């Protein structure tokens, strides 16, 4: 963490000498003091992948991403546990500090299936099979103004309905394609 802070300070010290910017969110303009320097807003890059269309599985909710309390994995599992329908299934793919929490939840509730780290091509197939994709990250922390979750772009490209919180860094143009 100490080295990360040093690196961050070093990067910020170089910002005044930057002549143009590619930004993830509109809020970065102020944070980086862009001023009148040229800038381009580019939320992310998506490399289209040709996936054979998958048959939808009934009542399958999918989360792919970092397993961390800050990104809402515990909230997702708690909310899923409140669903009183044995036909619902929650698939979780990823790795992180809350891996053990997820594994324990899967042991307690057989409807929760933890896949671990999954190859990207298989993740795309799972996203097409799922009934609903979910990003449980909340927008109350400051960093969410300056980030755009790559999973949002992946989820939208899959064509599967996506539910998530309205994050500050999410452009208004995306809202009609998401359940917020």
Residue ranges of predicted features:
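Short alpha-helical segment that forms part of, or immediately flanks, the ligand-binding pocket
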Residues: 124, 147-157, 168-171
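Acidic donor-binding loop of glycosyltransferase active sites
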Residues: 19, 127-146, 160-161
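Conserved acidic donor-binding loop of glycosyltransferase catalytic domains
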Residues: 135-137, 158, 165-166, 172
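Donor nucleotide-sugar binding/catalytic pocket of nucleotide-sugar-dependent glycosyltransferases
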Residues: 3-51
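Nucleotide-activated donor-binding/catalytic signature segment of Leloir-type glycosyltransferases, i.e.
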Residues: 100-127, 132
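Conserved acidic donor-binding segment of nucleotide-sugar-dependent glycosyltransferases
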Residues: 176-180
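Glycosyltransferase donor-sugar binding loop
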Residues: 64, 89-102, 116
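Conserved donor-binding/catalytic core segment of Leloir-type glycosyltransferases
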Residues: 22, 52-71, 76-80, 90-91
């Amino acid at each position: 963490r100490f080295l990360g802070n040093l690196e961050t300070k070093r990067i910020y010290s170089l910002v005044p000498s930057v002549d143009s910017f590619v930004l993830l969110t509109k809020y970065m303009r102020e944070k980086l003091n862009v001023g009148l320097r040229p800038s381009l807003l580019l939320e992310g890059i998506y490399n289209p992948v040709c996936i054979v269309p998958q048959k939808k599985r009934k009542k399958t909710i999918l989360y792919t991403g970092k397993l961390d309390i800050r990104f809402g994995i515990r909230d997702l599992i708690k909310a899923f546990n409140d669903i009183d329908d044995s036909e619902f299934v929650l698939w979780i793919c990823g790795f992180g500090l809350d891996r053990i929490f997820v594994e324990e939840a899967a042991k307690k509730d057989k409807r929760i299936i933890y896949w671990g780290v999954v190859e990207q091509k298989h993740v795309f197939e799972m996203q097409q099979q799922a009934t609903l994709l979910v990003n449980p990250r909340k927008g109350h922390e400051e960093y969410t103004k300056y980030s755009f979750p790559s999973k949002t772009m992946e989820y939208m490209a899959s064509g599967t309905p996506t539910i998530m919180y309205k994050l500050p860094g999410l452009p208004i143009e995306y809202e009609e394609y998401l359940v917020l």
